Curated annotation (Swiss-Prot):
This is 8-amino-7-oxononanoate synthase 2. Pfam families: Aminotran_1_2. Homodimer. One of its GO terms (molecular function) is pyridoxal phosphate binding. It catalyses: 6-carboxyhexanoyl-[ACP] + L-alanine + H(+) = (8S)-8-amino-7-oxononanoate + holo-[ACP] + CO2. Substrate binds at residues 21, 133, 351.
Length: 389
C-alpha cells in the first residue's frame, strides 16, 4: 500500500467525523480587523489579549535589536546563541514572576515538555489535571515518572489521588493556571494547600494568565496570593512576542540548563524577540488600563451570551467557550459567523471531548464596542436560526 493511500483513508475518517482542519491565510498584523482568505473579518480567536503584538513600542524595540543582532540567534544558548538580550529578559521575567531566576525556551510548549521530561524521576509520580494543555500531557508522557490524572479542578479527587500515591518518592502536581479550552482558573490556593499537606511540588503553566490575571498581571500566583514551586509560561499570548520560559529557584534553573533537552538542543529565540518581550513586560508593569478594559469586555460578553441561553463555560477570563455540542453543527456555526465577518473557528475533537464542540471566543483589549455589538447580534441570530437558543 502506498503511504498516500493509507494517509488518505485516515484523513477521510476525520472528514466524516467533522474534525478535519485546514489553514487560513491571514494578511497584516494580529489586530481585530484582518483579511482572512481574501475576506475582511473581525478576529475573535486571538491570544493577543492586550494588543501588544502590534504595539508600536514592541515593534520599535525589536527593530533596534534587529539592527544590532540580526534576524536569528544561529545556535543553542549553550554554544553561540546566547546574547545580552536573552539574559536581560530572563532577569525581567524572574522579577515579574517574583522568582529567583528564569530560563527561556523557544516556545511555551517546549518549556512544558522540557521541565516535565527532565525533572521527575522514575520513583516519582505526576498528578495532572484532566484538561491540562497538550504540552503538559506530552511532557508527562516523556517523563520517567508515573502519571495519575485527576478530574478537572476537582480538589476532592486530587486529595484522594494524593492519598493513594504516598508510596512514591516525590509527587508533582501539574496544572494550567487558566485552561485554554474551558477558560477555567485552577484553584491554585487550594492546590498549594494540599501540596503542603501532602509534601508535593506544584508546577503551574501560566500561559493564558501571564499579563492578564492579578492586580499587576503577574498571573494566577498573584490572583490567589500564593507561590508555586515552578511557573511555566509563554511570551506569545498577552506578552505579544515569541518564546516560552520556566521560572523558579536558581538551583532549578541551573538544573534545567543542564538537563532539559528542549533547552539544550534548541536554537535560541532571536534577540529581537527578547527585546520585544522585555518592552512588553515594561508596559504591563507600568499600566493597568488595558487589563481593566479587557475585563469590562469579558463581563459584558459573558453575561449577554448566557442571557441569550447559550451554554457558556469558564471563569472570568478572556477565553469564553460557547458549547454547541455536535461537531458538524459547530463547524456550520463557525461558517455562518465567518459569512457575517466574524472569525471564531470551531473547536472540535480531539482538542475537546466528543459532544463538547464549541466556538471559543477570545477577547482582546483592542476590540471596540462596535465589534462587541456585532458579535452579540450575530450570535443571537445564528443561535435562533440553528435552534441552539
Amino acid at each position: 500500500m502506498k503511504i498516500d493511500s493509507w494517509l488518505n483513508e485516515r484523513l477521510d475518517r476525520m472528514k466524516e467525523a467533522g474534525v478535519h482542519r485546514n489553514l487560513r491565510s491571514m494578511d497584516g498584523a494580529p489586530v481585530p480587523e484582518r483579511n482572512i482568505d481574501g475576506e475582511n473579518q473581525t478576529v475573535w480567536s486571538s491570544n493577543n489579549y492586550l494588543g501588544l503584538a502590534s504595539d508600536r513600542r514592541l515593534i520599535d524595540a525589536a527593530q533596534t535589536a534587529l539592527q544590532q543582532f540580526g534576524t536569528g540567534s544561529s545556535g543553542s544558548r549553550l554554544t553561540t546563541g546566547n546574547s545580552v538580550w536573552h539574559e536581560k529578559l530572563e532577569k525581567k521575567i524572574a522579577s515579574f514572576k517574583l522568582t529567583e531566576a528564569a530560563l527561556l525556551f523557544s516556545s511555551g510548549y517546549l518549556a512544558n515538555v522540557g521541565v516535565l521530561s527532565s525533572l521527575p524521576e522514575k520513583e516519582d509520580v505526576i498528578l495532572s489535571d484532566q484538561l491540562n494543555h497538550a504540552s503538559m500531557i506530552d511532557g508527562c508522557r516523556l517523563s520517567k515518572a508515573d502519571t495519575v490524572v485527576y478530574r478537572h479542578i476537582d480538589m476532592n479527587d486530587l486529595e484522594n489521588k494524593l492519598n493513594e500515591t504516598q508510596r512514591y518518592q516525590r509527587r508533582f502536581i501539574v496544572t494550567d493556571g487558566v485552561f485554554s479550552m474551558d477558560g477555567t482558573i485552577a484553584p491554585l490556593d487550594q492546590i498549594i494547600s494540599l501540596a503542603k499537606r501532602y509534601h508535593a511540588f506544584v508546577v503551574v503553566d501560566d500561559a493564558h494568565a501571564t499579563g492578564v490575571l492579578g492586580d499587576s498581571g503577574q498571573g494566577t500566583s498573584e490572583y490567589f496570593g500564593v507561590c508555586p514551586d515552578i511557573v511555566i509560561g509563554t511570551l506569545s499570548k498577552a506578552v505579544g512576542a515569541e518564546g516560552g520560559f520556566a521560572a523558579g529557584s536558581a538551583v532549578f534553573i541551573d538544573f534545567l540548563l543542564n538537563h532539559a533537552r528542549t533547552f539544550i538542543f534548541q536554537t535560541a529565540i532571536p534577540p529581537a524577540s527578547c527585546a520585544a518581550a522585555h518592552e512588553a513586560f515594561n508596559i504591563i508593569e507600568a499600566s493597568r488600563e488595558k487589563r481593566q478594559l479587557l475585563f469590562s469586555y469579558i463581563s459584558m460578553i459573558r453575561t449577554s451570551l448566557k442571557n441569550m441561553g447559550y451554554v457558556v463555560k469558564g471563569d472570568h477570563t478572556p477565553i469564553i467557550p460557547v458549547v454547541i455540542g455536535d461537531a458538524h453543527k459547530t463547524v456550520l456555526f463557525a461558517e455562518k459567523l465567518q459569512g457575517k465577518g466574524i472569525y471564531a473557528p470551531a473547536i472540535r475533537p480531539p482538542t475537546v471531548a466528543p459532544g463538547e464542540s464549541r466556538i471559543r471566543i477570545t477577547i482582546t483589549s483592542d476590540h471596540s464596542m462596535g465589534d462587541i455589538d456585532h458579535l452579540l447580534q450575530t450570535f443571537h441570530s445564528i443561535g435562533k436560526e440553528l435552534h441552539i437558543i
